[in-house]
Amino acid sequence: MAVTGGGRPAVRQQAARGKQMQRTFNNVKITLICGFITLLVLRGTVGINLLTYGVGGGGGSDAVAAAEEARVVEDIERILREIRSDTDDDDDDEEEEPLGVDASTTTTTNSTTTTATAARRRSSNHTYTLGPKVTRWNAKRRQWLSRNPGFPSRDARGKPRILLVTGSQPAPCDDAAGDHYLLKATKNKIDYCRIHGIEIVHSMAHLDRELAGYWAKLPLLRRLMLSHPEVEWVWWMDSDALFTDMAFELPLARYDTSNLVIHGYPELLFAKRSWIALNTGSFLLRNCQWSLELLDAWAPMGPKGRVRDEAGKVLTASLTGRPAFEADDQSALIHILLTQKERWMEKVYVEDKYFLHGFWAGLVDKYEEMMERHHPGLGDERWPFVTHFVGCKPCGGYGDYPRERCLGGMERAFNFADNQVLRLYGFRHRSLASARVRRVANRTDNPLVNKEAALKMDAKIES
């Protein structure tokens, strides 16, 4: 037999009446106290006036008046503090009352409130999410595009619209050199996007305090995908990565059936479970429901603190060669693709035919040789598409390589790419180590004819 506790409603009503009576009593008390305060103020004012004007008005009288006024003010403040304290206690009781009811209610008396209590407990220990779950995004996006023909998903050349996304910390770098090379890297990205008709966003905002460091890109990418339904591909690129083949274009037709394009090595990924099998410094996400769900699955290891520390232990145990440190976005993605292969890998394109990510240490000293033997537009080891300064940390902190070597390599990479831009105007850098330029051709004597030649971005560059 279920005991329903039929007397509880009467008890609750009696408690409510008691609360109402207590509240009425407090109001009366406050009224009386306010009247008493008024009398004190009048008494103090009259007394002060009598002391000041009724008696000779000497300096001693002024001191007595000041002391009397201070005492009155102190009494008033003390009484007001007591009133506030009483009111706060009443408010706390009213706020805690529902929690008390939930705590004392059993499953047989009120299953709804029990469910609500359990939901609150789950929410206090919930899995991190990037935001409210988005459903049917593909259909919603198609509908939006049909209603907004002024925002087509293809550019003027008929190619899928791409949004390049990069970011840097809100605060300045530790020294001016870091800010200088960050500016150069941004200028490099702007040049590539301008040449190829790509839009660019450089974010300096942390959209979620929980996802700092490597993880800051995830909420940013999600927000941009939802805010720009006209964009077909969102392309993330780290701030310390530079385009070094300004003529190379992404082979987007190759990815017609893919939603994630990332540089990596399939053998390292599946056979060796290496933690460097993929690189998240440069990757493309299609703006679709699948990508939103991948971001949702990717994010829970990212919140800073204990969650990230514990996830790091899992990743170190799961992936070959990974040092023991907190969870990073690259290891987390590799772990997800390996442990949930059937769910995700069908739509992942692991690109190894060109350098969507090229490790800088083996490239920056070979640029002169590349100019002697090859030409832009290849994108692979002969003329790398992207040179990524992994482990350098030019903006500050402790990098894996000497700072001078990193900054020198970034200077060479920037000038190597900048020469491909400057030749449109008849200039080039004096050397890859120098910011100074010299004129190598007169592009102004017959500008339209010269422009046709200059626009051949894949033409050989003289060393």
UniProtKB/Swiss-Prot annotation:
Glycans are attached at N110, N125, N442. Residues 82-125 are annotated as: Disordered. Probable glycosyltransferase that may be involved in the biosynthesis of xyloglucan. GO terms for molecular function: hexosyltransferase activity. It comes from Oryza sativa subsp. japonica (Rice). Keywords: Glycoprotein, Glycosyltransferase, Golgi apparatus, Membrane, Signal-anchor, Transferase, Transmembrane, Transmembrane helix. Residues 1-24 are cytoplasmic. GO terms for biological process: xyloglucan biosynthetic process. This is Probable glycosyltransferase 3. Residues 103-118 have a biased composition (Low complexity). It is an enzyme of class 2 (transferase). It is found in: Golgi apparatus membrane. Its EC number is 2.4.-.-. Residues 48-463 are lumenal. GO terms for cellular component: Golgi membrane. Disulfide bonds: none annotated. Belongs to the glycosyltransferase 34 family. InterPro entries: Glyco_trans_34, Nucleotide-diphossugar_trans. The keyword Transmembrane applies. PANTHER family: GLYCOSYLTRANSFERASE 3-RELATED, XYLOGLUCAN 6-XYLOSYLTRANSFERASE 5-RELATED-RELATED.
